[in-house]
Amino acid sequence: TDPPTLWLGHVGDSRCYRQRRGKLEQLTIDHSLVEEQLRAGQITLDQAAHSPMRNLITRAIGSQATVQPEIQSHRPQLNDVYMLASDGLTHEVTDEEIAEILTAIPKPQTVATLTKACEELITVANRNGGNDNITVLLVAVAPDASRA
């Protein structure tokens, strides 16, 4: 049988990350003016992080009559952890901090351990500034017992 496919639709600056075998990867690209400037080489990462325009979104639901989402497909693997998070979290918590927290989740992941990791991510975001709403969701890829 074909391996399962994870479909990801994205607009705006909320992000999806994947933690696979200890490596964190940002799967989405922010639809923001600052991200466009960064990709064009007009500003540095440090300038982007402190830009007063970092919340200027170029694509979002509700900003126009229609919006074209970015659609991606991924092949999830056992023990992958996917994180969906608002900019309130990703602007306050570094990728290194995210990776450290996600790597520390014991395997096999459970609802309790994923909930604890979400709480820890929110605590770190609040400790680091927490000036915006903070939303985070973790999804772990578990073995499919029906295929065992």
Protein language model regions, located:
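A generic hydrophobic-helix recognition signal that picks specific residues
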Residues: 5-6, 34, 80, 126
